[in-house]
Amino acid sequence: MEVKDTNCTSLGYGKPPWIFKGSALYQLHLVKAENARAFIPKECKLVEAFGYTLGGFFLASYDDSPAGIFDELVVIAGLVWNPPTSCAWAARVLVGSDEACLHGRKVVGLPSQVARFSKKITALPQKPESKSSSFLRRIGLRTSSNYKNHMDVEVTEIKKQTAMSICNINVNATASQQDSKGWMGPLIKMSLPNFSGRTKYNSDLLKYSCQIECRVRAVQPAKVSGPSESDADKENSSEDQSSNVESVSRVPRGTKRNFSISVMLSKPILALEFNHLKMRVEAPTTVTACSHDTT
């Protein structure tokens, strides 16, 4: 099914694989299948059950990458069949770097947009913890409740000369996050396969993988709130003015941002904190079509 590598040495990123280091929050949501399908090509089969698929978001802060230091929010629409497993499909990728945005669009086929990440940390008193909860937390079977700070991350998309609020993510920061000696979970290695492409910047259907090595543990899901109505109206007006640009995407004009926000606001089921993250992104390959054979 894979036929060729894409041109990966352009745009200043150098040759693959590309290495990203930092920390991240990986939060899984139950996403309505009808919303996820708005982003996924017709030839790809959505993994769904009872009208829902598994999506969510990946909020990362990189302190070392081919594009330097920057923040990233990947909104995951859902899972697409790739027998015998499945691949994630990104609905929107917001990055705090022009270089990362251009590379994502042109090389990896991602729906990337430049964004501003504004962070505000507020100190909170720590809550008492029982002996049993403390033991379970240390072995990774219970989320920590010793919150020392919480952090609000306001994500604002920068489109031409317009700034539009996407969402606010309230992340609970635990005491051990502030203390490098704190227990941050077991060291794991895993592979996250992804489909991408079918955009106005890259019309090919692509597949790439992220090889992740990090300390991981379960945490309390972040609380997400959407933008104000004025920002929503601003986005729709901006989309209308740029309607002469044809997109390969199936998402109706003026709704891409709204569908992405609906994914962010959907029901969270699991949140994983990645510390000492090292992510190795392989070169994307062009595929002929998504396989529908799930047997």
Curated annotation (Swiss-Prot):
Disruption phenotype: Pale yellow flowers. Absence of neoxanthin and reduction by half of xanthophyll levels in petals. Residues 221-251 are annotated as: Disordered. Signal peptide: none annotated. One of its GO terms (biological process) is xanthophyll biosynthetic process. It comes from the Eukaryota. Required for neoxanthin biosynthesis. Probably not involved directly in the enzymatic conversion of violaxanthin to neoxanthin. Is necessary but not sufficient for neoxanthin synthesis. Seems not required for abscisic acid (ABA) biosynthesis in response to drought stress. This is Protein NEOXANTHIN-DEFICIENT 1. It comes from Solanum lycopersicum. The lineage of its organism: Eukaryota, Viridiplantae, Streptophyta, Embryophyta, Tracheophyta.
